[in-house]
Amino acid sequence: MAEPVNNLIDLLLNDNIKGLKPYESARRLFSGAGNKQQVWLNANESPFANDFTIDAERFNRYPDCQPPAVIDAYAAYAGVQPEQLLVSRGADEGIELLIRAFCTPGKDSVLICPPTYGMYAISAETCDVGIERAGLNDDFSLNVDAIKAFKGKVNLVFICSPNNPTGTSVDKNQLLEVVEHFADSAIVVIDEAYIEFDKDNSWAAELTHYPNIAILRTLSKAFALAGLRCGFTLAQAPVIQALMKVIAPYPIPEPVAQIAAQALSSEGLVTLEQQVAVINQEKALLKSALAEIADVELVGDDKANFILFRTPQKSALMSHLVASGILIRDQSKQINLDNCLRITVGSPEQNKQLLSEISRFFTLQTSTQEA
């Protein structure tokens, strides 16, 4: 029966899905590694695992679509009004909701600025929405003129700041020029997943002035809750109301809402600040150590919780680290990132282990060359 079933699936499968490949998330790339791989530094997760309490009293009831405790707490944290906020299953769902709400399949397009986060393109492809590209400049700043040339051709402009994987923040004047240029034709989506590591560059305070911006946020990075899948879209009320038309009826499970509210409490925010400080300190130590290695070139900036670097020994180093139980992310397939690897800042112990293995690798390479 396998062949008839496969033929049926091929017959019924959505045409724009047929040529797609599943997104290679950091977790999927090493699926099945389990406990064999102890040091996960490939997904920009936090090294901290915080404790929370769960009340099961309401587990027999469907949850609120937009849990008030979470909405109110995050609105206060971000400095916006509750009606300017939508909570979703990670910022990734926010990306998909924006595309579904503001792009007509088979007709409209979005603009991305590579090298950047891959889910903008993946979500557009799965929704049968076109993808235009305006690559970043060599210094990873926005190519504003290239972006502006797409006015009237795209409905959404995705800009990641701080940018994954380059760690660079977008100049506010450049971003303002883009926002104003598309004021009557497109929504500019500013992905601030890493904004806790670059707080002074948030656009949240500008929401009231610019109706064509939407901001993506998450609890997955600095808040150390990647496993929770809880993200936010910040925008003026008409944008939020449009997203509410396409979001699922019960997107936020009750346990997720409870934990998110605790993470956003006054005590939770103190923990956040303390842990961000530790990560920033460890990031500086990692950068300093990597900069001393002859075959390593630091790339981009450090406005997030990761470090990007280039080495001609990229493949061999990656293989060595995997064999040593340390997983980092290969970014060399992205434009202008040849031979680049990305390291998530881990715990002090993880970072020491990483640096030890990197040092051992280059020592072995030198010994081999001398022999």
Swiss-Prot record:
SUPFAM superfamilies noted in UniProt: PLP-dependent transferases
Catalysed reaction, written as an equation: L-histidinol phosphate + 2-oxoglutarate = 3-(imidazol-4-yl)-2-oxopropyl phosphate + L-glutamate
Key word Amino-acid biosynthesis present: yes
Molecular functions per Gene Ontology: histidinol-phosphate transaminase activity; pyridoxal phosphate binding
InterPro entries associated with the record: Aminotrans_II_pyridoxalP_BS, Aminotransferase_I/II_large, HisP_aminotrans, PyrdxlP-dep_Trfase, PyrdxlP-dep_Trfase_major, PyrdxlP-dep_Trfase_small
Gene Ontology biological process: L-histidine biosynthetic process
Highest taxon listed in the record's lineage: Bacteria
Pathway: Amino-acid biosynthesis; L-histidine biosynthesis; L-histidine from 5-phospho-alpha-D-ribose 1-diphosphate: step 7/9
A Pfam match: Aminotran_1_2
Cofactor (UniProt): pyridoxal 5'-phosphate
EC number(s) from the headed UniProt entry: 2.6.1.9
Keywords per UniProt: Amino-acid biosynthesis, Aminotransferase, Histidine biosynthesis, Pyridoxal phosphate, Transferase
Modified residues (N6-(pyridoxal phosphate)lysine): 221
HAMAP family to which the protein is assigned, alphabetical: HisC_aminotrans_2
Subunit structure: Homodimer.
Family per record: Belongs to the class-II pyridoxal-phosphate-dependent aminotransferase family. Histidinol-phosphate aminotransferase subfamily.
Family matches, as NCBIfam families: hisC (TIGR01141)
Name of the featured protein: Histidinol-phosphate aminotransferase
Organism per entry: Pseudoalteromonas atlantica (strain T6c / ATCC BAA-1087)
